[in-house]
């Protein structure tokens, strides 16, 4: 069973910048996948699966124009592409309206983090990929401070 706990974070300026970079990459991947699906549909092609789009996304990710994407965790863009495909499928099933492109101004900045790769302490939380090397990722400066202490139960207190 996975339990969700909503917590408030207090990131420093470097961490805040990194979070906005993650959200921007997520928005970029979502918009790219949606544009690719629309383009394919207009040409008379069928639905492209999220696995196919993720394979296609590696080309722009490794190009010089989008080199900034290499600093972002792969899981962030992967989940954004999955979300775009799900929204597109739901439209054709008649469950939702046509998916809109994500705007920097209108959309709420958000990104995906794999729940297995998040680490918690009593006072801090560490996200996946906040630094470029494993050694730097273990340092305390990469841990984001929690606003409420003791809100997340320790492994000892979980039964």
Regions found by a protein language model. Give the residues of each.
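Nucleic-acid substrate recognition interfaces
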Residues: 1-159
